[in-house]
Amino acid sequence: MLARITPSPLKGTVPAIASKSMAHRLIICAALANGETHVTCNTTCADIEATVRCLTALGARIETVEDGFQVHPTMKSVEFGLLKALAGGTLDCGESGSTLRFMLPVACALGAEATFVGQGRLGARPLSPLSDEIIAAGCDLQGLGGFPLKTSGRMRPGTFILPGNVSSQYISGLLLAAPLLAQPSCVQVTGLIESRPYINLTIQAMKAFGVEVNVERIPARDGQPEVTNFRVSSGSYRTPGSVAVEGDWSNAAFWLCAGAIGTDPITVEGVSLSSAQGDRNVLAALSRFGARIVRSTNAATVQSDKLAGFEMSAHDIPDLVPVISAVASLAQGRTFIRDCARLRIKESDRLATTTRELTALGAQVRIAGDDLIIKGVDAFTGGEVDSHNDHRIAMMAAIAASRATGEVVIHGAEAVNKSYPDFFDHYRLLGGKVTLEEE
């Protein structure tokens, strides 16, 4: 699909969609609980549908209802944490890294004989050292490095050791699986943890289902790195009856950034300022640029002001880098975005694709090691860009187009369906002029 955008100011109010990150976690916990759970979720997307497919393949029954999902669990009961092996089917993860990295340890903890498949770059994205720990715990994984990936054997409880500089999804996946094991287990992380807020979301979701994760941090000393122990007891997830998925800061960030570079304020309603989502820090970043921020209990408003570049780290907010780079492109002076290494293994190599597509629109962006250096310009030009089948690159380009001097054409615009199928509808709601065409 091709999106043809005529530059037009974006302004007004838009509702937040459901947090994709939290929806994954709550639906997984619900499918593993001791009874039915109603999950209120105001939107869905391709990634969430992938998680639902995988849980269904493991025996859960998940009904789509008007306001979300009714989840009938995989297991009706768990006695002393002992589970019978499941004859799992094919688990189709689509292009969702979260689905694969969460469901692989869960399937192995259940003792499922399952076959994982996926699409796009997913098969090439790394699974080690998560896969190493699963194998060490007694499971057999055949086909690592691509698809199909076959699992057999049941994961033994124990201590799972991961470095802190790997995907937080590995840590979250092991945490989600831990209550299914026959005895208490520990996920031990050495060194500074990247994207820690996502682990906090996992702990929050597990707590909603009666599972406590005890966290012990041992500071670095005598030349040894810090160690964080996440200890989880064995036993069943316990349904609270109903849970609600909060609004999504990751996708709200696109509209808030549009407000920062536009001529009029933009408000996103339905986001919690007390959320554990790391991407709520988009407000702090935009404030550092100089944008005007208005916060309320359930909404945030951003309006442009004189923007100036600064130095920031992407350590805990890697998914914000593309759209923050668009803001930086229109800020005076230089912006340095550090700690971007993890962007290379997303749906695209986002260091490369962010640089390439913003440059195609007249920005001055260059890569220096694992950092981005961006020199501000007065406006984006028109031009043609490619999403590289990456939802965040497509949405970044659309936000940049609102401040372009000519028409912007986005190839592969259907990539937004991965996380935000209503993106272009909401773009029009805010006054954007976009037509969608078949390529």
Over which residues does each language-model region extend?
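Short, structured segments at the rim of ligand-binding sites
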Residues: 1-439
